[in-house]
Amino acid sequence: MCTRVFWSDNGVAKVCSRTMDWQVSDDPVLWAVPEGTRRVAGDAAWESRYGVVGLSMWDCGTTDAVNSAGLAAHLLYLGTAGFAAPGSPGAITNLLWAQWVLDHCATVDEAVAALHDLPVVSAPARGQELGCHLALEDASGDSAIVEPIDGKLRVHHAPQYQVVANDPPFDEQLEHLRHYRPFGGDRLLPGGIESTDRFVRAAYFLHYLPKPADLSEAIAGVVSIAGTVSCPPGAPYEDFGVYPTWWTSATDLTNLTFYFWSHSSPSLIWVELSAIDLRPGTPVRSLNPRQPCLVGDVTGRLTPAALPY
């Protein structure tokens, strides 16, 4: 359904790519939200410390984004997620989980500390309860996977946690990976589209990815791995559900650039955070990134808009 790959040790740049796979399009919108933006979500209210560029899902919340400090966050589906009880004091919803982290934190270390006592509750999106876990990485190369299990947040925090997929929970994915070459087992590379197969395949190709000569090769390398775990339209899972890849993103945490490919368009677009004014008092801006006419740097094409969430 979704896969995230973080290439942190290539010697050129800290780069990440993720796929978005679902039954229907999540209608992504590209947002640039300045620091100092005020948000209210249930009992929680805050003012952002950092500017954020990234994607929303169904105008309900942030699914994939990077902030001006070089911290990125990605929500991926996790069917076995167990959130805190509804009405928990000071809770935020899963739909604003990634946004809350990016608004408050500059590093993975800060995020892990801030999330320690934060209750996260489930809120429906278009009538669906969507279990999810949160992948984080920063410009230092640090990484964390945060999963709501039995009402508590379980944190896996280490730079080597570079690959995330969906179910089962992350610790079980790591155990499954050990059955395959070159991770301690003797099984050959799997070719299916199930979450466990995608996890192994992404880890395998990342293990063998050659050092890039420059930034272009670094971005191309991590995106090529995302391509190996993308799902074409029509291909069924074991449960006969069809969850194609709707888009792929990439984040250059070293140079603060956010890339986007819609799988209904042949073109790549990107936003340079250094070229957009994210200071307090500047307007929130947005762009529909699925327009087939878009190509290249679209930083200047974002226009003022009202936040729907």
Residues covered by each model-derived region:
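C-terminus-biased signal that marks the final domain/tail of proteins
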Residues: M1-A13, V112-A114, A123-P124, E129-L130, ...
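Short hydrophobic/aromatic-rich beta-strand segments that constitute the beta-sheet cores
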Residues: A73-L75, V155, F258-W261
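Compact, glycine/acidic-enriched structural inserts
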Residues: W31-E47, G79-V120, T282-C293
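Catalytic cofactor-binding cores of redox enzymes
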Residues: D117-L153
